[in-house]
């Protein structure tokens, strides 16, 4: 198992053990999605249909069961960069939701479904990041630097749009 697969497996365990926080009773997927690293330009086109500050994205439509793909920008290092790892976790939560057909109520609008999915992913992402900040502080006696985004939507930093510039080759 390579380092990225090992990280993904550990994030699966973390997600599984924290689902109660968001009142979810998901079955753990018995496989991992393919994680494909693509250029920022390509990911922007896929995720936003125009240039946008996206780092990671799990498309919830047109996935083939057992062959799901999660996208991250080339150069992003979820193994060594906590900020990128939290984005990966957020996108993996969407994979779990997709795997479990979460929020598939025919009476709900796409906006309602999107909001519920994002809310659940945000809560788990923030909890994970907070735990990691605490672990880092206990281990080093220092605050984690640089601080990660406070809010990520569509795999991008909402509160600090310039944050992504360090990951995008211009």
Where in this protein do the model-derived segments appear?
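A metal-dependent hydrolase signature that marks the N-terminal structural subdomain at the beginning
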Residues: 1-59, 156-158, 162-163, 170
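Sec-exported extracytoplasmic/periplasmic mature domains
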Residues: 20, 93-101, 126-133
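Surface-exposed patches in mature extracellular/periplasmic domains of secreted proteins
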Residues: 22-33, 102-114, 133-144
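Secretory pathway export signals and precursors
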Residues: 44, 48, 79, 144-145, ...
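Active-site scaffold of zinc-dependent metalloenzymes
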Residues: 46-82, 92-99
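Post-HEXXH active-site segment of zinc metalloproteases
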Residues: 81-82, 86, 98-127
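Long, well-structured alpha-helical subdomains associated
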Residues: 126-170
